[in-house]
Structure formats: C-alpha cells, structure tokens
Amino acid sequence: MYFVNLLTTIIPILLAVAFLTLLERKFLGYMQLRKGPNIVGPYGLLQPITDAVKLFIKEPLQPLTSSLILFIIAPTLALTLALMMWIPLPMPHPLVNMNLSILFMLALSSLAVYAILWSGWASNSKYALIGALRAVAQTISYEVTLAIIILSVLLMNGSFTLSTLITTQEHIWLLLPSWPLAMMWFISTLAETNRAPFDLTEGESELVSGFNVEYAGGPFALFFLAEYANIIMMNALTTILFLGAHNNSLFPEMYTTNFMLKTLLFTTFFLWIRASYPRFRYDQLMHLLWKNFLPLTLVMCMWHITLPIILASIPPQT
C-alpha cells in the first residue's frame, strides 16, 4: 500500500514537470512575440511526451576519460533527492508525517549539491567542473539565508512541522507581517534552483552548458527532471510558508486546489523573471547574499526572537 502511495506522489510530479517545460517554452515564446511549440498535438500539448521519448531512446554516451560509476550515479541521485523532498509537504496530508520535516528538507537540499559536484568532476571536462564549482558555491551560500529565513518563520509557527503552518496561517498569511523575509526567500529560491537571473552554472557564452555539458539522452533528461521538480517543490514550500492555503472546514477538498493554484502562480513568476532579466555577474551574486541578505536576515531573525519576549512582559490589557 505504501508503494502505491509513493507512486501516486511521484507520477503527478513527473507529469507536472513535463508540462512545466511546455509552459516555459510557450511563455518564453509569447514574451518574445512568437508562438512556441505548436506542431505536436493540439497547441503543442504532446510536445513533452515526444521530448521524453526522443531523450530516452538516444544512446547515453559518456567520455572515455570519465569516471563511469559517478557519471551515472550523479543524475540518478539528483532526481531521487528532488523527488524525496516532496515526502513531508502537506498537500494537505504529507506522505510521511515528520516532526522535523523542515530540517529533513534542508538536509536533502544540501545533499543535492553532491549530485552537481560529482557530475562535474566525473565528466572530466574543465567546463563541466567550473560549472559544478560555481553551482556548489552558489547553492551552499544561498542555503545560509534560506535556513535563517525558515528559522524566523518557525519562530512564528512554534514548531518544526510543516503541517502546523496551515493552522498558524488560519487568519492571516505570514507574507503580510514578514514581507521582507518573503522577498529575500523568493530571490534565494531562484538562486538555490539555479534559475535566471542566477543561472551562472549554465553560462552558454563561457561554459557551453555548465555541469551537464557531457551528458546526453537519458542521464541529461534526469538532470532536467530534477531541476524542474526542485522548482515546483520550492514554490510549493513558499506557498506553505508564506501563503498558507486556508483549510476551509466547509470545503476541505478545496485545500489542494487552492494550494496548487498558488504554486502555479509562483512558478509562472519564475518563468516571467527568466524571460525578463539578464544574468548576474558572479561577484554581484555573492555580494547580494553575503553583504545584503545575510545581515538583513540575521536582523529579522533577532527581531522575531525579541518580539515575543518584549510582548510577554506587557500585562494583559482589559
């Protein structure tokens, strides 16, 4: 039975990822005053299926000088971790109800760095290695702010469990009292998922394609699936943390619809940013975090710690 539950979580995620690629291509097409994919099926709706078939029937080539085992393990690990991060998300019920679900997600997002590093190193290509090192530095750096922002939100939530955020946001979204945190969180998620304008790992002009330059066919598709699964997951987490989908007791079945609509809104915002903004320079990317976001998030965290203590000393107002 548990295996069936796992499949009913994984298959919709993979389908969502497939159609997110179509949505992105359509979105970029219309932003650039063209149609986007519109040949395969009505309005190009079958494009993701043909893409998947094409990629998985291609021969998975690897360089002769590559480290074969790591070369194959890296994309598999990337997708496995991307799918595992969906386990504790309440939609409205998580697959596994954990007490420390936030810590579990932080630990898994840190492990995702290894997949990128191994893929770059095992390819035995200088472009792939430079791309991987950039990705690792960027991901590790932005995880610092993500962790501090999550800590600030959890101080308001009073628990490490994601499910309790639904109760916390019953009357007001946490986005409203903590909008500076939400803005920094959203920008950090862009950097964490290596999306434009922070897609320095894939700098076509200088690094060809980044850490996955030597991958073709199936293994490349696994990296692609992992990246887009992470994007949807990060937006789902943003929705849970800041735009808690209200669990209406009259229409409890509307929770998931509400939740997915907000996640789709954030994901579309990701695509809009990609179509609108140019890429950051690497030093600007690091300065943004270490000189701007880190001091700000630390101040906000201290504020969320001191506020309850200050208010606790006020006598009850009658």
From Swiss-Prot:
Flavoprotein is among the record's keywords: no
Subcellular location, principal: mitochondrion
Catalyzed reactions: a ubiquinone + NADH + 5 H(+)(in) = a ubiquinol + NAD(+) + 4 H(+)(out)
Record key words, sorted: Electron transport, Membrane, Mitochondrion, Mitochondrion inner membrane, NAD, Respiratory chain, Translocase, Transmembrane, Transmembrane helix, Transport, Ubiquinone
Gene Ontology biological process terms in this record: aerobic respiration
PANTHER family membership: NADH DEHYDROGENASE SUBUNIT 1 (PTHR11432), NADH-UBIQUINONE OXIDOREDUCTASE CHAIN 1 (PTHR11432:SF3)
Family to which the UniProt record says this protein belongs: Belongs to the complex I subunit 1 family.
Protein name: NADH-ubiquinone oxidoreductase chain 1
Species this protein is from: Nyctalus plancyi velutinus (Fine-haired noctule)
Lineage, highest ranks first: Eukaryota, Metazoa, Chordata, Craniata, Vertebrata
